[in-house]
Amino acid sequence: KSTGRYARNGGEEETIPAIEWLLELAAKPETARTRPVFRIDNEEVKDNLGLDNSEKHFSVNDITTGNNFERLARESGRIHSKETSLRTPYEKSLKSVADSLLIYQRLAKSFRPQRSVDFAGELKQFEEIFPIGMAAARAHETGAEHDEEDHDQFSGLIDTLIEPGAHEGDRGGVMFWPRVIPPGNDSDADWRSLNSSLFHSITNAAAADRDWKIEIDPAAKAYAGMLTAYKNDKPEEFNSALAGYRDYLDKNGQNAALGKTGKEF
């Protein structure tokens, strides 16, 4: 089971709000992996994974140390093929750990591009170089003369911001991408995920024959700004990005959502 607890202040166990833990998972994944948020009671499972029997809460790093991840995947597959009523307490507990770890991993991949280091900065840079980058990409495809550095920089940002298969996973419900991008003021469309918003911004802008310019949704930029600010422990920048996001919601007729977006850093 996953809990909201982790060791803090010299090892003393405390409970933090779920939203704080979720923000950490989204913006500081390396730190989140060290938090003992998984509860394991079965001593045989703990022995099998080389965990301290005197503890009950473990981090992702604890659970996946060495070749534990491969062993969990292999054992979970074996247990999955076994009728539920025939599973031993050990098998039920280990399967629960494996399933919880899978959910954790899907959550960790659902808030931002995994290769991103400075999400807000990368979006800004991408907007700035898009015209030159698209020209270089088209020239590269046809073998025309172009600056290869422009092409490499543009391609690198594409690879950073759009992960292969992420859009299909988002549409199919495999990923947990939160729907944080509202439709326009005059639209009855559904809210979209950040991944879907970026994908459509890029494909729409790239469809032009020339004079390429990309318009990234202001809500997407505000969302990226919040994650980057939280990662860097910049409360003023976080609150500024949050204010921008709330302003966008207000201007686009999303007053009902404003009450869900008031959590300042």
Task: Report the location of each language-model feature.
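Soluble extramembrane regions of membrane proteins in the secretory/endomembrane system
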Residues: K1-E264
